């Protein structure tokens, strides 16, 4: 539960910004308000996950396709370094650090498109994607597949092979959807 008074006290603010934050979370589908009980974090559902990942799949494939044409050598070098950073982070038990490295990897691809409207759309989707990303990254059995997909994405971008990059990005998102769907079903 999201307790207004406790959150306000903990953050040293009045209840007004807490209420506004909860309202924003509700608009994003991340919280629900139950009459006479208050707000709580929304449960992950298969339908929500499918909706979010369907949009992510289309936008990630588009970003990868554009990146094939637009990505600079400097961005490729940064992407390779971030790919290695992600691999190193998987050796820790810090899911937050792993997720940050994964977000950074994808952000480089998004930025390389040179399309601020696409980047903005992906950023707007980020908070909704984050909870599914974290669930996926909690299972270390997914790491070898993720690392191979990141490597294949980088190779495709280096070769400017749109088919390879978009196919790998498609599979990358599909693998996440399958794994998270199984986790949601286990929790029900």
Model-derived regions: residue spans:
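Short linear motifs at protein or domain termini
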Residues: 1-65, 69, 111, 177, ...
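Residue-level signal for the nucleotide or nucleotide-sugar donor/cofactor binding architecture
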Residues: 13, 141, 159-160
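Mobile beta-alpha loop/short-helix "lid" or hinge segments that flank ligand
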Residues: 26-32, 125-127, 141-144
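Alpha-helix N-cap/N′ positions at the starts of helices
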Residues: 36, 59, 81, 145-148
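Conserved amphipathic alpha-helical segments that form helical-bundle/coiled-coil interaction surfaces
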Residues: 52, 73-135, 148-155, 164, ...
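Short helix-capping/hinge motifs at transmembrane helix termini and TM-loop junctions
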Residues: 68-69, 114, 138-139
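C-terminal peripheral helix-coil segments that are non-catalytic and often amphipathic
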Residues: 152-159, 167, 175-178, 182-188
């Amino acid at each position: 539960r999201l307790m207004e008074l406790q959150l306000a006290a903990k953050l040293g603010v009045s209840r007004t910004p807490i209420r506004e934050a909860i309202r924003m979370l509700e608009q994003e589908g991340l919280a629900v308000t139950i009459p006479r009980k208050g707000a709580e974090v929304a449960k992950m559902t298969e339908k929500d996950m499918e909706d979010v990942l369907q949009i992510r799949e289309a936008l990630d494939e588009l970003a990868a396709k554009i990146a094939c044409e637009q990505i600079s050598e400097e961005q490729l070098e940064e992407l390779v370094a971030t790919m290695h950073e992600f691999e190193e982070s998987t050796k820790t038990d810090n899911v937050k650090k792993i997720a940050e490295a994964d977000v950074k990897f994808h952000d480089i691809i998004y930025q390389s498109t040179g399309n601020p409207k696409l980047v903005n759309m992906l950023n707007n989707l980020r908070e909704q994607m984050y909870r599914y990303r974290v669930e996926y990254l909690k299972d270390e059995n997914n790491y070898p597949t993720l690392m191979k997909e990141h490597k294949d994405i980088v190779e495709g971008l280096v070769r400017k092979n749109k088919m390879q990059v978009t196919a790998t990005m498609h599979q990358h998102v599909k693998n996440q959807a399958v794994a998270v769907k199984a986790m949601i079903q286990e929790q029900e």
